[in-house]
Amino acid sequence: MATTADFKNGLVLKVDGKLQQIVEFQHVKPGKGPAFVRTKLKDVVSGKTIDKTWNAGVKVETATVDRRDMTYLYNDGTSFVLMDEKTYDQIELAPHLMGDGAKFLLENTSVQVSFHEGEPLFAELPVSVELKIEHTDPGLQGDRSTGGSKPATLETGAEIQVPLFLETGNVVKVDTRTGEYLSRVNN
């Protein structure tokens, strides 16, 4: 059991018999009336998000979540295959458990997978990854001064927008949560 004072992003709660992960929360102390906590909860099974308001100090049942470091091995077309870094056991994860950032994963990338009662709930990908640009249109003289962007295909097959000065073969850092270009990596 936990109280609303223990809320933090990523905490998994049991709400109405379902496992809900806190995505966002905010403690509110109005001038009149009691304090309360606004939360945005994500159902770990279906992925749907809901908004829920709690009175401050309310006790809430938390779920026991076991986090394990795993290595992404490959995608067999229907699921992602990962290996536990301690036991070397392999598991298959459905694409919805990996999230949208999975398109930026290279083989042998470390991923943290959360389990509840032996069942995988979701995977936490690295915040950023470094990937090589497989194809993009060549930059033209003078492109460095303008702030435009162009599409680029990365080595994983994912497509992102990159600055005009980047060329095929450059290595870039990409945010796996948003799919945005962060910076160029010096080789």
Swiss-Prot record:
Q: Name one GO cellular component term.
A: cytoplasm
Could you tell me which pathway this protein works in? Protein biosynthesis; polypeptide chain elongation
Concerning SMART domains, the annotation shows: EFP (SM01185), Elong-fact-P_C (SM00841)
Q: Which Pfam families match?
A: EFP (PF01132), EFP_N (PF08207), Elong-fact-P_C (PF09285)
From its record, what is one biological process in GO terms? peptide biosynthetic process
Q: Which UniProt keywords apply?
A: Cytoplasm, Elongation factor, Protein biosynthesis
Task: Please list the GO terms describing molecular function.
Answer: translation elongation factor activity
Localization: Cytoplasm
Function text: Involved in peptide bond synthesis. Stimulates efficient translation and peptide-bond synthesis on native or reconstituted 70S ribosomes in vitro. Probably functions indirectly by altering the affinity of the ribosome for aminoacyl-tRNA, thus increasing their reactivity as acceptors for peptidyl transferase.
Q: Which NCBIfam families match?
A: efp, PRK00529.1
Q: Which HAMAP family match?
A: EF_P
Tell me its family.
Belongs to the elongation factor P family.
Q: What is this protein called?
A: Elongation factor P
- Report the source organism: Corynebacterium jeikeium (strain K411)
Give the gene that encodes this protein. efp
